[in-house]
Amino acid sequence: MSPATVLDSILEGVRADVAAREALVGMTEIKAAAAAAPPPLDVMAALRQPGIGVIAEVKRASPSAGSLAPITDPAKLARAYEDGGARIISVLTEGRRFQGSLDDLDAVRAAVSIPLLRKDFVVQPYQIHEARAHGADMLLLIVAALDQSALVSMLDRTESLGMTALVEVHTEQEADRALKAGAKVIGVNARDLTTLEVDRDCFARIASGLPSNVIRIAESGVRGTNDLLAYAGAGADAVLVGEGLVKSGDPRAAVADLVTAGTHPSCPKPAR
């Protein structure tokens, strides 16, 4: 029987890929590598800087859009993002649908000095230690991909390694689950991962119900400064931008435009 949703299909592939990697590098070895890695950078300090932060993403493809950009040199792209003023760089490491890899994370870590988010579908504790071993400071946890006990344990493990969890939600119910699990940073994805449909009002609806001490990140739909300002007005502390940057002719300038808008005196301020 075929998987019921797009997310189910993605997770099926992820589990197979994790098992293959763990067969090559066991849990004991990856834990040791994580422990030996340089300490993680302070993600919360980066997110709490004045203005609306920009998280710039290294993203070759997606299930909804297909191929976006070849990105033969992720380190060069990451340096352009950093030069443009990005606070954090997101690196997609899922290979089947997003054409990413841990090699990309390694290359970016060696190239920049700002925090890194590993963006993947985390379903096994192994992936958390793997992220830390490859230099991640922040890790995506998708509520829709985890039952509540797994979400709680994955969040605890992420924080125990000194990383910050970006807990992704798409509905008010998922936001409630994220808060109950202890999420300090919540990302709202306007795209439903089970159907790939987009609900652009999703961020404003969910963000308005979050406590002021929770960092709110808008995760999709930013094509330019108007989108950033709209999300800022709805309570965003930061925006995550991928497709709009990798398809731009000048990624550094594209980031700089967003950063300028997000730090301009006229930009709505976060609620916290």
UniProtKB/Swiss-Prot annotation:
NCBIfam families: PRK00278.1-1, PRK00278.2-4
Keywords: Amino-acid biosynthesis, Aromatic amino acid biosynthesis, Decarboxylase, Lyase, Tryptophan biosynthesis
Catalytic activity: 1-(2-carboxyphenylamino)-1-deoxy-D-ribulose 5-phosphate + H(+) = (1S,2R)-1-C-(indol-3-yl)glycerol 3-phosphate + CO2 + H2O
GO biological process: L-tryptophan biosynthetic process
GO molecular function, one term: indole-3-glycerol-phosphate synthase activity
SUPFAM superfamilies to which the protein is assigned, alphabetical: Ribulose-phoshate binding barrel
E.C. no: 4.1.1.48
Gene transcribed to yield this protein: trpC
UniProt-recorded name of the protein: Indole-3-glycerol phosphate synthase
Pathway info: Amino-acid biosynthesis; L-tryptophan biosynthesis; L-tryptophan from chorismate: step 4/5
A Pfam family the protein falls into: IGPS
Family recorded in the similarity comment: Belongs to the TrpC family.
Stretches that traverse the bilayer: none
